[in-house]
Amino acid sequence: MKKKMLCPIVIVITFLICCIVYFKPLSLSDVAEADNQMKMIYSQIGVENGEAYIDSVNYQDITIDQKNAILSLLDKYTYRRTVGTLFSNGSTSDLGNKTLSIYVYDDDLLINSVFATSSGKVVINEKTYNMEDAERFI
């Protein structure tokens, strides 16, 4: 009788541990290192007088001081996996009105990409996650 109870309890405990590990906060600082190059695009999206617009600003030449400030900012923010993250293809429909794209390169090779939206969605390397302070991050 004890063996019959022990097996389901072990399965439930194992499942709970896996859920805790899967849904734990992940740090944005893992996407870039000090020796990587970065490029960023900030976009503001909206409708004015019935016409849709996208105002974008490219940040191509980021100085060392700016990169250090970006790295310390990335260190302060976290994101979380969702149930849909496992099956996502990087698409998101709820953009909000601001987006920030960060591209991280090692020499000329793109190694990581981050697409943050003001709605709280963040796409990292073609997987969709949730980010609580996304608008403040942008």
Please place each PLM-identified region on the residue numbering:
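Function-determining sites in protein domains
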Residues: 2-138
